[in-house]
């Protein structure tokens, strides 16, 4: 039986798990979440649902950067 807590199947289809990529690239929460949803797109939930989740976190990050730069 697969370990659904530490190594869920929808993240373990290649040699790289999203958590390892997120850590290696030093991504923040928003960008890390986007990577996570892109990586599992179509493997856990519907691909469009997963990609829309990724898009939402990218939009959150863009808003945060714009706010930081005084554009909002």
Role assignments for model-derived ranges:
Residues 1-72:
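Intrinsically disordered, low-complexity regulatory regions
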């Amino acid at each position: 039986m697969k370990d659904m807590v530490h190594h869920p199947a929808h993240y373990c289809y290649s040699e790289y798990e999203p958590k390892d990529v997120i850590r290696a690239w030093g991504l923040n929460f928003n960008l890390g979440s986007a990577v996570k949803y892109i990586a599992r797109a179509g493997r856990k939930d519907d691909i469009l649902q997963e990609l829309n989740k990724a898009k939402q976190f990218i939009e959150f990050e863009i808003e945060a950067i714009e706010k930081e730069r005084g554009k909002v």
